[in-house]
A protein has these predicted regions:
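Beta->alpha loop/short-helix hinge microenvironment recognizer with preference
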Residues: 1-391
Length: 391
């Protein structure tokens, strides 16, 4: 038995055999290499010396891969903090867009196109319905984030949208619906279904889709038509969570969803020579946590399913929050509402200062004597220090 193991440990033990027996994409292989070599010295080191006692500190560089569980916290904190300047004292809602599980094989075989289609369908649904005077009649703002996993690391692509519950009408007047969401869920469902299925059908008619693995049967014309009919007939079930309790809760909530990966280290409970045990929420049992044991290679397979395509943008901003609009329109909204501007806490701070603020840890302070440590030039030839000199 192996306690307190990490995802890096799991990859070290099981990935080599998995790679030799499975078809792995270059992007997945790169992510696996990064995870296995993060903070091992493979990506270089930072060497510092204490000005007072001469104690030498060696810090191994991280891989900075967005799929690495050890590399998400710092960029998440910086990203979320930067969003403070876009937040208004206004209603916000969390809307989740899901698709029928029958589409999963097709989506997995065509991630670049069909992930993009999820964003297109979700964003067009929100923008068009919000602009309809029957509902709100405004230009709203929202952030969309793609997640591809369920709690057990199964393939479950869905979009999380953090939606501003009000917006600007054609006369640049602010309108909102108070604490009630301005769009009926059934209308969202039908509109989203129509838009996503239309784009899927268009890709199919233009011969842009590929059919690999469990999607292979849908190469057949009649099988694909039956799949379309099945999904059209189903009621798609997006849902809207209750409004956030103030701007700060929106900021905290963003942190929960923006830089997540399929599974974090704290959920790994045990590892043996052949299996991995991890915790997962059981949504059939009121969301209670349970432990699941699977083979090590199955763990690797599930994890790698969620490596996004190369250069794929997972966090996207729309409407009032788009980069084109937000500087002018968010300022206008803030003036109309009379709400204060939330200032970034970390803006213009260097990494040591951010770490000191967030984690109460001074990386410029010698852990041995408390003196000031300074970096050695990276180009300087470094002779391995004797053990007694290391902090």
């Amino acid at each position: 038995m192996s306690k307190d193991c990490t995802i890096q440990d799991v990859f070290h033990r099981f990935y080599p055999s998995f790679e030799s027996t499975h078809d792995i994409s270059p992007t997945q292989r790169k992510a696996a290499y990064h995870i296995m070599n993060c903070k091992t010295g493979a990506f270089g080191v930072n060497v510092s010396v204490c000005e007072d006692c001469g104690c030498i500190s060696v810090h191994y560089n991280s891989c900075r891969d967005r799929c690495c569980p050890m590399c998400q916290e710092f960029p998440k904190e910086k990203w979320v903090d930067a969003r403070r300047e876009d937040i208004l004292d206004a209603p916000y809602f969390h809307v989740v867009f899901t698709v029928p599980e029958e589409l999963n094989p097709i989506i997995y075989s065509n991630q670049k196109f069909l992930y993009a289609a999820l964003y297109h369908a979700a964003s067009d649904t929100l923008s068009e319905l919000a602009a309809d005077s029957k509902y709100l009649g405004t230009d709203i703002g929202y952030i969309c984030i793609l997640h591809t996993w369920g709690s057990t690391m199964n393939f479950h692509p869905h979009i999380h949208a953090i939606v501003l519950g009000g917006g600007l009408d054609v006369k640049n007047h602010w309108k909102d619906n108070g604490k009630d969401f301005f769009l009926p869920i059934k209308v969202i469902s039908k509109t989203f279904r129509g838009k996503y299925m239309a784009e899927l059908k268009q890709l199919w008619e233009n011969d842009r889709l590929e059919f690999h693995g469990s999607a292979a049967p849908y190469k057949n014309y009649y099988a694909f038509k039956e799949l379309l009919n099945t999904c059209y007939a189903k009621e798609w079930i997006p849902y809207c969570k209750k409004p956030f309790d103030g701007a700060e809760s929106v900021i905290r909530y963003l942190g929960k969803y923006t830089h997540r990966i399929a599974i974090s280290n704290y959920r790994i409970k045990d590892m043996t020579e052949s299996t991995v045990t991890f915790s997962a929420k059981d949504y059939k049992n009121q969301g209670l946590w349970k432990e699941i044991t699977i083979s090590g290679e199955e763990f690797i397979r599930r994890f790698l399913m969620h490596v996004p395509p190369k250069r794929f943008v997972r966090i996207r901003h729309y409407g009032l929050l788009s980069s084109r609009n937000k500087k002018k329109k968010i300022t206008l909204c803030r003036n109309i509402l009379g709400c204060k501007k939330y200032i970034s806490k970390l803006k213009d701070m260097d990494a040591p200062a951010i770490i000191r603020l967030l984690y109460n840890k001074d990386i410029c302070k010698c852990s041995s004597c408390g003196g000031k440590i300074i970096p050695l030039p990276t180009e300087q030839h470094f002779i391995k220090p004797k053990p007694h000199m290391l902090c």
